[in-house]
Amino acid sequence: MVTEDLWRFLPLGYLFTVAVETPVLVLFLSQHHALKRRIFAGLWLTACTYPVVVLVLPPLFADSSRALYLAAAETFAPAAECLLFYLAFGGEGGDGVTRRDFAAVVGANLLSFLAGEVLAAYGWFGLFR
C-alpha cells in the first residue's frame, strides 16, 4: 500500500475504529469512571495509537508477512492504550478496577480488529485488495 492510500484510509479507519471501540469502553470500563471519561477514552486512546498502526507500522513491515504486521499492530495498540489509560486514570478505585479497565481496552481492540478483518475480506474502501 502506498503512503497516499494510508493517509486516505486514516480518517475513515479512525472513525470506524472509534465507532466500534467507544461503545465497548462505555459499557465495560469500570463504572468508577464517569460517562464523559469513558467516551473520551474511546476517542483519545484511538487517536494516540491509530496513526502508529496505520501510518508507521505498515512501511516498517512492508517486506514482512501480513501476519507479522498484524501481530505487531494488534499487540502495540492495546498495550499502549492500557498504559496510556493507566497513566491518565489508573490507581483510582483499586486493582479490580484497573484489571477491568485493561480487559475493556483489550476487548475493544479485539472487537475492532475482528470487525476490520470482516470489512477487509469484502474489500472495504478498496485498500485491501
Region annotations inferred by a language model:
Residues 14-30, 81:
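N-terminal signal-anchor/start-transfer transmembrane helix
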Residues 63-64, 83-104:
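Membrane-helix boundary connector in multi-pass membrane proteins
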Residues 115-129:
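Juxtamembrane boundary at the C-terminal end of a transmembrane helix
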Residues 1-8, 128-129:
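Short, strongly hydrophobic alpha-helical membrane anchors
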Residues 49-50, 70-89:
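Hydrophobic alpha-helical membrane segments
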Residues 5-18, 66-78:
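Structural signature of hydrophobic alpha-helical transmembrane segments
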Residues 27-40, 90-100:
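Membrane-interface helix-boundary motifs at transmembrane edges
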Residues 41-60:
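A generic, lipid-embedded transmembrane alpha helix
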